[in-house]
């Protein structure tokens, strides 16, 4: 089952409160209090619902309500509490005596929220209180540097480096062009000829080395053959002498 309406729909007045209605509500609450908001309009003689009477009393008719604009300190407190509590307007109102949750919600959506959004869009971590931009830095010793000047400085450095690189390329090309003349090509030809001569010398040395190896091999072979020859000669003479000593018969 749904909740029963707080009052009968027929005959209930809506819209802004008149001063006479406000005075009737104030007098009744001063005399009897507000223990039961549902029954209060009927006992007070008001053609209003209980919810309307409660909101009218809490947000406008209470004697301890502060009147007038919010001070910069109150606005700063609302901003800080909203960062931690969010849209819990009743909890925020409990930290600000004399201010209602409805009033705090209205001032947040009409002034503070738009002001913070504008400051964030400008790119700064600033909090605008009473029309004054207060820049908050986590590091008190940090130095604020103009980003535009830094960008201009970096662009100038880049341009200088590029121009220097191009200048070096141009100078090197001119130097090479100045060096490439007839003497350069004659030097290249002489170097080429010298390389060919060196290659011929290397081939000649390799041929001599191979021939020397062959000669040494042939000489060693001839030497061995001579030794065998003379060995055979000596052994044959010795055999002849032995046979000559045998007596004749």
From Swiss-Prot:
Main location: nucleus
Knockout consequences: Increased tolerance to freezing stress and higher accumulation of CBF genes and downstream genes under cold treatment.
Its biological purpose: Transcription activator that regulates freezing tolerance by affecting expression of CBF genes.
Subcellular location, record wording: Nucleus
CDD domains hit by this protein: SANT
Chain location of the short sequence motif Nuclear localization signal per the record: 198-205
One of the protein's GO biological processes: response to cold
GO molecular function, one term: DNA-binding transcription factor activity
Record-linked InterPro entries: Homeodomain-like_sf, Myb_dom, Myb_TF_plants, SANT/Myb
One GO cellular component term: nucleus
Keyword DNA-binding part of the UniProt annotation: yes
Superkingdom assignment: Eukaryota
Gene: MYB14
Keyword terms, alphabetized: Activator, DNA-binding, Nucleus, Repeat, Transcription, Transcription regulation
Protein name per the record: Transcription factor MYB14
Binding region for DNA: 37-61, 89-112
Induction per the UniProt record: Induced by salicylic acid (SA), jasmonic acid (JA), salt (NaCl), ethylene and auxin (IAA). Down-regulated by cold treatment.
Tissue expr: Expressed in imbibed seeds, hypocotyls, cotyledons, roots, seedlings, siliques and flowers.
Signal peptide annotation: none
Domain (HTH myb-type): residue spans on this chain: 9-61, 62-116
Pfam families attached to this UniProt entry: Myb_DNA-binding
Organism: Arabidopsis thaliana
Organism lineage: Eukaryota, Viridiplantae, Streptophyta, Embryophyta, Tracheophyta
């Amino acid at each position: 089952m749904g909740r029963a309406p707080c009052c009968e729909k027929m005959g209930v007045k809506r819209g802004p409160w008149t001063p006479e209605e406000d005075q009737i509500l104030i007098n009744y609450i001063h005399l009897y209090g507000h223990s039961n908001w549902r029954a209060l309009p009927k006992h007070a003689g008001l053609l209003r619902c209980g919810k309307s009477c409660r909101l009218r009393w809490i947000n406008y008719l209470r004697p301890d309500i502060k009147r007038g604009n919010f001070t910069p300190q109150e606005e700063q407190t609302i901003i800080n509490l909203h960062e931690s509590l969010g849209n819990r307007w009743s909890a925020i109102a409990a930290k600000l005596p004399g201010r209602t949750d409805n009033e705090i919600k209205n001032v947040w959506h009409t002034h503070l929220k738009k002001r913070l959004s504008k400051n964030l869009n400008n790119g700064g971590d600033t909090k605008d209180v009473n029309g004054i931009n207060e820049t908050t830095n986590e590091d008190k010793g940090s130095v604020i540097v103009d980003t535009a000047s830094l960008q201009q400085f970096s662009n100038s450095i880049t341009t200088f480096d590029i121009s220097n690189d191009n200048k070096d390329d141009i100078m090197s090309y001119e130097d090479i062009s100045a060096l490439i003349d007839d003497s350069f090509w004659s030097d290249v030809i002489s170097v080429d000829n010298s390389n060919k001569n060196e290659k011929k010398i290397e081939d000649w040395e390799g041929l001599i080395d191979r021939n020397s190896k062959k000669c040494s091999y042939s000489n060693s072979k001839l030497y061995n053959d001579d030794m065998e020859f003379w060995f055979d000669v000596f052994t044959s003479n010795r055999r002849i002498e032995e046979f000559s000593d045998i007596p004749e018969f």
